């Protein structure tokens, strides 16, 4: 039976389902936005006792997040020493979940408000050669702006070359698993390839 997953909070359901409602996991969230509304990690932290670190460049959202959540929300995901943070906070080498969704939104004319490649830069900032992630969700918004097709494709090349398996592919997001941790028989029931 194929599962149907939407975006935003459904990412948490996808992660929890693949990991058997794991308690005490670890996450890294690039692009936190609000602490609860549209959050991809609120349930992980508050219902399943996950430890994690989030990033939000907008100061008002970061302040709101830090006032309402226990796990910290930092500023710039592109200028952060991930390895030191992970070591200082006892993150495992196999982190359960990486969420990448850092963009500044879109103007009325459909152009990005800032770089079209911020999420890709965020992915490249994470030490992918030193740490692995069991589940990765990457928002590329290829449906929003034509240049995002390039970002989507480069992200796919990077994660595929690192041995990750693409499980969910929509017009705006890609969801990946580490097949060294989650076997094909487990993740194949979640396959969803809506778009290139």
What positions do the PLM features span?
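SAM cofactor-binding core of SAM-dependent methyltransferases
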Residues: 2-84
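Secondary-structure boundary motif
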Residues: 20-21, 46, 67, 88, ...
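Conserved acidic-Pro-Pro-aromatic motif
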Residues: 43, 50-51, 93-100, 104-196
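Conserved amphipathic alpha-helix within the SDR
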Residues: 84-91
């Amino acid at each position: 039976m194929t599962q149907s997953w939407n975006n935003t909070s459904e990412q948490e359901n996808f992660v929890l389902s693949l990991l058997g409602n794991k308690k005490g996991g670890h996450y890294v969230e690039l692009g936190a936005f609000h602490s609860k509304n549209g959050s991809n990690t609120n349930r992980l932290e508050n219902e399943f006792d996950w430890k994690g670190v989030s990033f939000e460049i907008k100061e008002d959202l970061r302040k709101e997040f830090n006032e309402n959540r226990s796990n910290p929300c930092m500023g710039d995901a592109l200028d952060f020493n991930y390895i030191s943070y992970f070591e200082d906070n006892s993150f495992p080498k196999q982190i359960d979940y990486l969420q990448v969704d850092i963009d500044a939104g879109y103007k009325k004319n459909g152009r990005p408000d800032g770089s079209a490649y911020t999420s890709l830069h965020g992915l490249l900032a994470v030490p992918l050669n030193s740490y692995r992630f069991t589940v990765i969700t990457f928002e590329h918004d290829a449906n929003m702006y034509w240049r995002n097709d390039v970002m989507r494709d480069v992200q796919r090349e990077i994660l595929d070359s690192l041995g990750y398996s693409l499980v969910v592919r929509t017009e705006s997001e890609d969801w990946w698993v580490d097949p060294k941790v989650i076997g094909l028989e487990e993740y194949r029931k979640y396959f969803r390839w809506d778009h290139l």
